[in-house]
Amino acid sequence: MSGSMATAEASGSDGKGQEVETSVTYYRMEEVAKRNSLKELWLVIHGRVYDVTRFLNEHPGGEEVLLEQAGVDASESFEDVGHSSDAREMLKQYYIGDIHPSDLKPENGSKDPSKNDTCKSCWAYWILPIIGAVLLGFLYRYYTPESKSS
């Protein structure tokens, strides 16, 4: 394969034991990364490459949203927004190929373990018990009768 783009002409292996589909154009991530401007904007969503340059002015969230995800894997951002089935259907018209199998990240466990998602709510492990203790203290003082000294 020469360059960053390859077209699979027959079903088979890519030389690394990974199956490639027939008549699919494969792009390397480095090729996609070059397409990150208003003149040419490509996105990767679930291993598929989309040229959304024509869609920039039509995107309901504005062109800035697309520019932020240009040239990279935008799968997580795409899913986080919760696009409608109409938006997913519309996306098909911008499909130009797939990411080369050797550039694909594994679907299961694809998150970087150094970026622990549970730590986003670490504050809850400290703040909520403190608030609960303070609340219990106030309730205890409010509902217990004051002791009278003789």
UniProtKB/Swiss-Prot annotation:
Residues 1-21 are annotated as: Disordered. Keywords: Acetylation, Electron transport, Heme, Iron, Membrane, Metal-binding, Methylation, Mitochondrion, Mitochondrion outer membrane, Phosphoprotein, Transmembrane, Transmembrane helix, Transport. Heme binds at H59, H83. Its main location: mitochondrion. The modification N6-methyllysine is found at K39. It holds the Pfam family Cyt-b5. It comes from the Eukaryota. One of its GO terms (biological process) is nitric oxide biosynthetic process. One of its GO terms (cellular component) is nitric-oxide synthase complex. Residues 24-100 form the Cytochrome b5 heme-binding domain. The modification N6-acetyllysine is found at K34. Cytochrome b5 is a membrane-bound hemoprotein functioning as an electron carrier for several membrane-bound oxygenases. Belongs to the cytochrome b5 family. Component of a complex composed of cytochrome b5, NADH-cytochrome b5 reductase (CYB5R3) and MTARC2. This is Cytochrome b5 type B. It comes from Pongo abelii (Sumatran orangutan). The gene is CYB5B.
